[in-house]
Structures are given as C-alpha cells and as structure tokens.
Amino acid sequence: MDIQQLEVLCKQLYEATDIRIRSEAEKALVTFVSSQDALPKCQLLLQRADSSYAQLLAASTLTKLIQGLSLQERIDIRSYALNYLATVPNLQHFVVQALVSLLAKLTKYGWFDSYKEEMVFQNLLEDVKKFLQGSVEHCTIGVQILSQLVCEMNSVVEMDVQVSFSKMRKIATSFRDQQLLETFLLSCSLLVSARDNSKNISFMDESQQALISHVLRLTKNCLSFDFIGSSTDESADDMNNVQIPTAWRPAFLDSNTLKLFFDLYQILPNGLASYSISCLVQITSVRRSLFNNSERTKFLTHLVEGVKDILTTLHGLSDPDNYHEFCRLLARLKSNYQLGELIAVPCYPEAIQLIAKFTVESLHLWLFAPNSVHYLLTLWQRMVASVPYVKSPDPHLLGTYTPEVIKAYIESRLDAVPVIIRDNLDDPLDDFCMVQQQLEQLSVIERCEYNKTCNLLVQHFDQKAREYENLLQTPNANSIDITIHELQLTWLVYIIGSAIVGRLTVATSDEHDTMDAELVIRVLQLMTLTDARLPQAGCEKLELAILSFLDQVRKMHSSEQAQKANLNKRLSEVFGLTDEQMLLSFINRKIITNLKFWGRSESIITKTLMLLSELSVHFNSVRKLARLEEVQFMLTHHTSEHFPFLGTNSSLSEMRCRTMFYTSLGRLLMFDLGEDEERFYNFLEPLTNQFESLGSVMMDNNIFSNEEAKKVIIGLARDLRGLALPLNARIQYTMLFEWLYYADYLPILLRAMDLWAHDPAVTTPILKLFAELVHCRTQRLAGNVSSPMGILLFREASKLICIYGNRILHQEVPRERLYPMRLKGIAICFLILKNSLGGNYVNCGVFKLYGDDTLDSVLNIIAKLILTIEQRDLIEYPKLSTAYYNLLNCLSQDHVSYLAALEPAAFVYILKSLTKGLAALDSATYISCCTILDSIVSYIFKQLQMKVSTFPNKKLRSLNQENVQFLKVVEMNSELLQSMMSSLLNNVLQEDCRNQWSMSRPLLVLILLYEDYYRSLKDRIICAQPIEKQQTMAQWFDDLMVGIERNVSSKNKEKFTQNMSTFRRDVVNLPKSTAAFSCDRPMCDGGFEPSEPESSPH
C-alpha cells in the first residue's frame, strides 16, 4: 500500500458520507497498522504533511506500535516527534494531540530505560522547557505535552499484559517524586505571569485563551494526581482527600498559592474561570496532616475569605460552569475541615450568612444548574451532622440559617410545580434517584431546629390538602389545578417521609415524637382521601410518594431505638390504631388496595410489592403480619379477580412483579405452616385451577397461536419460582414438588417449552423456575434417603434442557439478538445442571447402573450447546461466562470422568475456553479456571499413571475405552495445555501475580506432565537474563522442585505452593534489565530515521 493510497484512505475514513466506503477504508487501515512496513510509512506520512488525517493516522499508529519497538527505535521516534512539533507550523489540534499522546506513552513505557548510562526518557521536562521559551503556539504545545504526560502517568489502564499494574505504579511513583512538583510549580509560575500581565493579554485572542486553558488544565492534572495509588475516581466526587506529598508543603503554606487562583477567577473570562475554581476544589481537599493546627487555621482562613469575597460580589456565578465548580468548592469546605475549625475562622459569621443566602437563592433558581444543588445540600448536611461534636464556645449559627434553607427547599419545589405543568418542562419528580438523594440529605438538615421544620410542613400541608379536597368536591374542577395540587402534595409527602426517618439518626424528645405523629397522621389522612378516589382516578406520582412514606414509617417502627409512645397515642386518637399490629394492618390494607386498583401501573405495583417484601422478610414483622386478617385474605384470594395484575391482560414486563409477590406470600405462608398439607394445597388452589384448565388446552394442535395460554404459562412459571424461593425447609419444599410432579403439572411446562422454545418470554421464566427447583437451598433436597425426589427432579430438569437445547440448536438467530434469543437461555441451562449436580442429592452412578440415559443425554446436549458459543462471547457476556465456568467447576470437581467422556470437539473447546479464562482480568474467572484446570490435568495424570501401572490386580486399574480415547485427544492437543503452562509460569514471573495459591496447583501437574516442555521454558527464561544472573536464576528453578514427588496429592501440591512462594519472592526482587523486557513484534527490519521533517506545504 503506497503513501498516496494511505492518504486517500484517511480522507475517506474521516470525510466520506457513504458508510460502506468508510467501512472499507477502516478495514484497509487496520490491515496497514499490523503490516511489516508500518513504521517507515508512518515517517513518510509525517514528512509529506499533505493531509492532517494522514498525520493523525501516522501518530496514532506509532502509539499502537510502541511496545513492539526496540529501545533505539523508541528514542528515534521520541526525537523525531519533538522535532516535528517544534518545526512544523500550523498543525491541526487533533494532530498535535496525537503526537503529544505518542510522546507521553513513549515516556511512560520507557521511563526506566537506560541508554548510554542516561535515563533518556526522563529528560522530557527539560526538552519541553525549550518550547516554553518560544512563541505562544510553541508554549501551548509544551504545556500540552506536560499535561498529557501527567495524565498518562496517572492512568491505571494497563497498556499491555506485559506492563503490570505494580510496574505502572513504580513508574508513576518515580515520576511523582522526581518531576511532578517541578511541573506543578512551573505551571503556577506561568499562571503568575498571566495574572501579572493580565492587562497586556487579550483573553479574547484564541491562541492566548488556548494557552491559559492548557496551563490551568496542567495545574489541575497535577493536583488530581493519584499520589498514593488509591485509584480514586474523581468523577464520582466522593469527597476524597488529595494526598499531597510532604515535599509540596512550602507551596501550600505560601498564601500566594491560594491567592493566585482566587485572583485568576476574578480576572479570567467565563469559560476559563471555572478551571481556576476546579484547582481550588483540589487545593481545598489536601490532606489535613499536611499542616499543623496553626497552619491549617491560617490556610482555612484564607480559603474562607476567598469564598466570602466571591459570595459578596457573586462575580461570575451567572455562568453555569463557574457556578457548578463553586458549589463543589463549598461542599469540599466541610468534607475536609471540622465544623469547629470553620467556626474559629474570624469571618465565619459573615461567611455562613452569605452561604445561606446563596443556598436559598440557588434553591429558588431551580431551573439553573439543577445538578449543583446536591453540593449545597451536602455542605449543610455535613455541618448539621457535626453539631453534636462541636466544642467551640463560639456559636455555629446553624440554628439561624438551616430553617431558611429548609424553607427555601420546600417552597421552591412547591412553586416549581405550576411552572412545570404550564410550560411542559421536565419534572424533577421523574428523576427518582435524584429525589431520594436530596431527601436523604434533607433528613439530616431538617433535624436542626426541628420544631420550625415541622410547623412549616404542617402549615403548607394543611393548606394544600384543604385546597385539594375542595377541588375534588367542586363539580367540573379544572383538571390542571387538581394535577398541580397532587404534585405539590407529592413533594410534601416525600419531605415529610424524610423528616420522620431522620429521627433514627438522632436522639429524639417527647416533643419531637408528638411532631412526628402530627406529620404521619396528615399523610395517612391524605392516603384515605386518595384511596377513596381510586376507582375513578388517581395520581401515580403521589401514590409513589405515599409508598415511600409508608416505607419510612416501616423503618421507624421496626427500629428498637425509636420512641413510639406519643406517636402511637396520636394514631390511636385519630385512626384507632392502638398498637404496631394495627398499624401493620393499616399498611397491608393499602398494599391490597394498590394491588387491586393499580394493576395498570408497573412502577406502583413494583413499589407496593417491594414494601410487602420488606415487611415479610423480618421475623418480628412476619410474626405480626401472619395473623392479620388482610394477610389471610391475600393467602386465600391471590387471583386475578382480586388482584388484576395476576391476569393475562398485564404486559410481559408487568408480569415480572409476580415473582416478588409470591415470594412474599410464601414467607407469610411458611411462618406457621408446619406440616399442614391441607392448608398448603388450599393456598395452591388458584394455581391448581390454572394448571387444570391448561391441561386439555395444551394438547390442542392450534395452541401455538393461543396468546392467552402463553401468558398463563409465563405467569405460572413466575409465580412458582417466587413461591419456591422461600421454601427452605425440606417438608414444605417436598409438598410443592409432590404437587407439581404427581399432579402431572411438570409435563405441561415441558410441553410449553417444546411449543415456544423460540420465544424467550416463555423459555426464560420456565428455565429460571427449574433452576430454582433444582437448587438445594439450605439442603432442602438432601437427607431423605427413602425419597426418589432428587432423581425424579433431575430427570424432569434434564428433559427440559434436552427439549430446549434440541429446539434452539436448529434456530437461526441474528447476531444482534444472539444473547436474548439464545445465550441467555443456554446460560440458565448451565445453571440448572450446575445446581442439580452440585446439590449432592443425585447419585449419578445409578443412571448407568440401571441403563437410564438421562445423564448421558443431558451432557450430550450441553456439549452441543457449548460448541454453539463463540469463545469471544464468553468474555463479552459476564452472566454467560459465570454460568459456564461455574458448571465446568462443578463437573471437574465431582464428575471429571463425564468431562473426559465428552466428544473430542467439546473437550478441546473447554481447553481453549480455559486458555481464555486464564487471560481474563476478572479474578473470579481466573481462580475458577485454575481450579478446573487443576482437576482436569490431575485426572489426566492419574489416567496416565494407570496406563503404565504394574499394580497386581490389573483389572482394578485398567483403562476403559472412553479413557483411552480421552488420552488420545489430550495427546493430540497437548499444545493447548503447554500454552496454559506457559501462561501460568509467565504469571509467576510477573510482579503482581494474581491468586498464587490457585495457579500453583495446576502448574505443578502440568510440569509433571510435560517435563521436557517445562525444561525448554526454563532454559529460555534463564538465557534471557544477563550472564551474571543466569546461574542464580537456574538455582532458583532447581529449588522450585526441591522435595516435589511425582504425584498429584494435596500434600505434594502444598509443598510446591510453598516453594513457589519463595521462588516468586526471589524473582520479583531480582533487578530487571531492559534486555530482559522484550516481546516479539511484527515490525519492519528497518529503523525509524530521526531525519529532519520537511517544512509543511501549508
């Protein structure tokens, strides 16, 4: 491929509008990147400089090739890139960025490389200083290089498996200790120059603006560096401290550093000023131990004064970016400093007043930067939470200002509703996660001056509830007015819920108890009013708020610490609810009401069932619930007549709720069921009736198109799975199984699977039901030697897998629908077989003994299903990967002979998948693969021992035909096992070896199986070392096998693990040379000439 053709392809890739042309160009360029002549052609593309896109391709290709280059080539490319950036003018910004990224990666990759006794890649800072002395454009490029270098050094993404995480940390630590502080001080000096010459700088000039922007980014990158390798996620904004090294102390003790960024904020235009606040956010978060007490006070004083000055003038806060970063700065003030320290600041009274005023105004301006409110509420939440621990004699003044904040929050939410309805704006109530987060913050803030909060809530609630009730009684009332009041009441119900749950975190008084009672009563009265309207109309958002409130009441009453005397007294006076059991009855009536009238709303049904589930999961509440009349009603009337969401008119997504419903009913039923079979079968009567009506229908030849029958099957599968989940006792579980098996209901499910195997909406619930039925949860299937239940259940589950597998194998599925249409079902089949065989309730030997082909059939179909899965899909779909490796783990532990009996193609597939698993980043997958491999190779070793055995009674030790065939397959694919040995041994030699115990066990067996190959690997590793270290390395390898016998006993493996631990310690401590760190590379024979680039034609 010539240079002109490459330039055309680049143009097509980035400019063509035809997708086909772009796709073909992309394929051709991917081929070029891996070609042997990529390196010299990249140089030619850069030298010609005819196309910016070609320059981009050259720079990005060189970046990908870094690890395949020799030290000399990397040095040459480094020199060329620096020279190119310095001498070629008017480069496009994306080309500059690509070259800057190349330089940063080269520097990181070669940080410890020595050339002619010089650490050549550690000189980049000195080279960049030459750029800083040039024009504005050169200075900008120099700053970009430093900024990208800091980002690259801070990156935890592994460049390659050969660059371990620990090596990257060593590089980052070395860079931090040698150059990061100098880089930070250099960026600060550039900012000082910009500030001092601000009158002579035109910030509207694009080049000047770009330079200042990059310098500020560089400064922030320095302050955001992962100094101690904690890998904190700055995007999460979880208030982590910045672990500034002690060597940086002078920079932070100098008050001019803080002043610099406050000054820049005042000087810089919008678009740049926010970067200076971002830097202040990081500076505010420096670790407390960097200062002593007096230094910290002085630092905090300057910080609070700077914040106060901004709040006084509100300069720049009309810009959303500035506003957002300033809110983050306010939140960090409290995250890193104690309230007592803030109170000690001389200007604290004035500052807290301004912060309160700013918060109130921000809450009322709810349309402006709504995501920033979180930081303001965080500040107030943290300050209020600290009040009990303050020992300062000075007043904290929070009692004065928090009521203002709460009032602003409540009134701003209420005032927003008419505007949202009138102008059809996005409703914040639709963002449930954000609402919940704010309510959690409010629950703390509200408890400061709680009587004021309660009085305000009562005042607003009474007014809105009265107006709402009047509207409902007014004929032909405006529906918009009704909606507005319903949404306003929704906010008030949410806020009241947050207020009463806040009592769980503080010591409450009788007065507070009475206030909570008043709030609870009002919401319950509103609930009674809205329930009376339900046959005609209802507000979904208000119902969700009431459910959230009831959940808070549940938490309050389930807490042993909460005082409830006054609350119960008021509930008794108003509603006649004299004790907790009557309150639970009241809540359950609401649950039944919702299930009856809100069947059309998936969100309300789901939240209602979640509330029922929470009530049924705790022993204390179950004990009280089980006796309630309302609960007995649910246990005897769970039909679509009383609960419409159980009918066939529900959508498929709504039917998912049914599992949760029956899990809750199952818990309530099991509480005092004991061995009462009659009561259990009475409970099952609605399900029995459905099965009986399906029995004859399912045999009809026209059933395939019967949508109602299909929905009944889906509903039954979900119901039964929900019911099976809480049946942990063997007696109750046996009742369920016998009902299913002896009433011939399982064949109906098998028939449904046969009919609708192509439809995941049917197959997934049925497969999940069987996965639960075969799960030996709390040994519910084990222990009864007189019962054939385990065998019978396994046979039915095997039939299901065989029916599904045979149908799905012949079904064509498009790639984009592969997971939902096929792979998800296959994963559940793996889970069913794993649960069956791993439950230890099926004696698999009896099948062969009595000529039953159940086990062979299911293993054969599983083998066929395995072969339909592409290896890449095992990595791409985590649930499939987990189910697959868990099944293999189960089979290899107790049923390895069945793995050996698989057809050769399936066994080879398994070996290849283990190879993939050993390269996986997920530790669970890696450990699982090591365990599976250990079982398989140990079995191979024992079979080979048996083959050459001289045991007197040869008949006991002879190989059957299956094992002879198995050993032939192993022999033909020995390179797979050898490659895994190589992978495991390579892992041992890495600095951050994972799961040493797990991987040492299969490694020993592989060494015993393939001694010659191990010897060749060992020799190659030893020869790769410098001559003076080879003898030492050889001795360490000899010591690795000291005391190791030729067997695969646990004792022998333990000894090898101990030896390997010593071996690893010695190898990791051996100083590495650059010669030893190399890999094969598909590169050209010629080097990269560091010649002068041609001048750019443009």
From Swiss-Prot:
Its main location: cytoplasm. Keywords: Cytoplasm, Nucleus, Protein transport, Transport. One of its GO terms (cellular component) is cytoplasm. InterPro entries: ARM-like (IPR011989), ARM-type_fold (IPR016024), Importin-beta_N (IPR001494), XPO4/7-like (IPR044189). The keyword Protein biosynthesis does not apply. GO terms for biological process: protein export from nucleus. GO terms for molecular function: nuclear export signal receptor activity; small GTPase binding. It holds the Pfam family IBN_N. It is found in: Cytoplasm; Nucleus. PANTHER family: EXPORTIN 4,7-RELATED (PTHR12596), EXPORTIN-7 ISOFORM X1 (PTHR12596:SF2). Binds to nucleoporins and the GTP-bound form of Ran. Belongs to the exportin family. May function as a nuclear transport receptor. This is Ran-binding protein 16. It comes from Drosophila melanogaster. The gene is Ranbp16.
